[in-house]
């Protein structure tokens, strides 16, 4: 079975994670795909395939004769889809021999324009897989799941030599909880790759340092007719706080290695207002500056309006994996070689986000990220192609073979 055929099956299983639940997994529906994958792994010959109570799927293949001394290699992808768009009743559409032009999504009439998505032109002649316009596709990261499963199937069917192979599928990556309960000792790998990136040939080993901040403003309400020199309007103070942040350090004005402050939510009235931010930067020192800047703005406003008017709570989310990958840079070098063996040139760009691999790397399992062949994640314009998924599968097989040498 080819990877895209598995993808078409997996995306029809509803696995959207729930950021509000506070449970692990965040949604019981994630077990539906987990149990399906366990049964599929067992049918392929992965005898120890299992799912734990938190919806983590594990399995392994013992090393083939002569490869017992080779390192244990892990391959990891996540099963959940992002809550940013509906992941229920996904209806994937295949566009065979795609002409490289604008694409109309049939259920809504939405048009994916090449002017907005220039990468589409590079897919000319391939079989493009899109949504029907009503949901996301789920290639993030069910394409990664499908490619790992297909690589495992190929290894077993063809009797390819390999060291110990460890397979892991996680829940809740999209809400930042994918690695939180991952059993690294039970997984059994010396190092691993997540398969959760962009185009075929990408290898990612740098990501943002990340934090979240909640700003609470306490106002003082009096009748507006007699409010002069007395009222403190919390909503106005909130706008003043946000206005003190640099306009050119927002997601919509940054790229590459530029960090940002992202206002995710705001609400309030005269008495109280709240601002929710995420802070991102590849440079840890620059992220610390952003944290300090929030505190400095709060201190200034408290001096202006009174102590306790503005409170800032900051929590770290994840860290740049680069520091943990550098001592194991063979992972990047092997990926580069495997990508070139597949006829592609490696694409190495810092991730403007995070991956399970970043958290796992800091937990002791070095874990760079590989591409899945997907684009436009988290929305109705998400897409991939049959051929790019095939190339990603071949890259995995090349990596397995290189570590068996």
Question: Where would I find each of the regions flagged by the language model?
Answer:
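A non-catalytic alpha/beta surface segment that caps or lines the substrate-entry region
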Residues: 22-70, 74-76, 80
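Active-site metal-coordination/substrate-binding segment of hydrolases
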Residues: 67-164, 169, 189
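Metal-dependent amide/peptide-bond hydrolase catalytic core
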Residues: 235-405
């Amino acid at each position: 079975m080819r990877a895209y055929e598995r993808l078409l099956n997996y995306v029809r299983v509803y696995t959207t994670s729930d950021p509000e639940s506070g449970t692990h997994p965040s949604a019981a529906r994630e077990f539906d795909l987990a149990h399906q994958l366990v049964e599929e792994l067992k049918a392929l010959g992965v005898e120890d395939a299992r799912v734990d109570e938190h919806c983590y799927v594990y399995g392994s293949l013992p090393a083939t004769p002569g490869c017992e001394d080779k390192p244990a290699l892990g391959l990891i992808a996540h099963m959940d889809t992002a809550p940013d768009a509906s992941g229920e009743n996904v209806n994937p559409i295949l566009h065979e021999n795609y002409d490289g032009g604008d694409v109309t999504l049939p259920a809504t009439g939405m048009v994916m324009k090449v002017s907005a998505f220039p990468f589409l032109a590079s897919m000319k002649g391939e079989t493009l897989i899109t949504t029907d316009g009503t949901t996301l596709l789920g290639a993030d990261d069910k394409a990664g799941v499908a490619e790992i499963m297909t690589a495992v199937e190929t290894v077993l069917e063809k009797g390819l030599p390999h060291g110990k192979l460890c397979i892991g599928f996680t829940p809740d990556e999209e809400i930042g909880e994918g690695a939180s309960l991952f059993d690294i000792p039970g997984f059994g790998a010396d190092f691993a790759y997540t398969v959760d990136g962009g185009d075929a040939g990408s290898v990612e080993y740098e990501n943002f340092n990340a934090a979240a901040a909640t700003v609470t403003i306490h106002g003082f309400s009096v009748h507006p007719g007699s409010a002069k020199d007395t009222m403190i309007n919390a909503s106005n103070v909130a706008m003043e706080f946000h206005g003190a942040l640099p306009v050119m350090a927002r997601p919509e004005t940054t790229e590459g290695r530029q960090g940002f402050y992202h206002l995710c939510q705001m609400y309030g009235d005269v008495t109280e207002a709240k601002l929710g931010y995420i802070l991102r930067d590849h440079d840890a020192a620059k992220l610390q500056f952003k944290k300090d800047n929030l505190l400095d703005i709060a201190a200034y406003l408290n001096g202006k309006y009174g102590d306790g008017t503005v409170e800032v709570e900051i929590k770290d989310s994840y860290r740049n994996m680069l520091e943990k990958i550098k001592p194991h840079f063979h992972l990047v070098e092997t990926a580069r070689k495997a990508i070139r063996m597949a006829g592609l040139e490696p694409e190495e760009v810092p991730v403007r986000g995070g991956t399970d691999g970043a958290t796992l790397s800091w937990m002791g399992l070095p874990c760079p990220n590989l591409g899945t062949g997907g684009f436009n994640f988290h929305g109705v314009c998400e897409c991939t192609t049959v051929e790019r998924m095939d190339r990603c599968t071949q890259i995995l097989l090349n990596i397995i073979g290189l570590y068996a040498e």
